[in-house]
Every structure is written in structure tokens, then in C-alpha cells.
Amino acid sequence: MPIAQIHILEGRSDEQKETLIREVSEAISRSLDAPLTSVRVIITEMPKVHFGIGGESAKAIGR
């Protein structure tokens, strides 16, 4: 059973996350020739202050 774990910054809509799950699942199914029903996707959202880019938080640089 393929499992994809995706870390994203908070702020995406539920619709965007549903689209991400669907499209990642389809890509994995297609590329690995695995049944779509066997694919698992885990989305982990993190606060912008928990992610650093170039020594500053994503929040501090306006991401």
C-alpha cells in the first residue's frame, strides 16, 4: 500500500486539500500501477511560524 506524506503550510482550503489528495493518489496509482483504493495520502499542516526559510519564519517573510 503506497503512502504519501505531504507537509504544507497552513492556510489552504478544504477544497484545495481534497484536490491535492485526489491528484496525488491518481499520480501514484498510475505511476506504480497500484489500485487507487490502496493509495494513502497524509497531509500535515504546519503553522507558518514553524517553517523557516533562509533563517526566518515563513510568517515573517510573508509566505
Curated annotation (Swiss-Prot):
GO terms for biological process: salicylic acid catabolic process. It comes from the Bacteria. Pathway: Aromatic compound metabolism; salicylate degradation. GO terms for molecular function: isomerase activity. NCBIfam families: PRK02220.1, taut. Homohexamer. This is 2-hydroxymuconate tautomerase. It comes from Stutzerimonas stutzeri (Pseudomonas stutzeri).
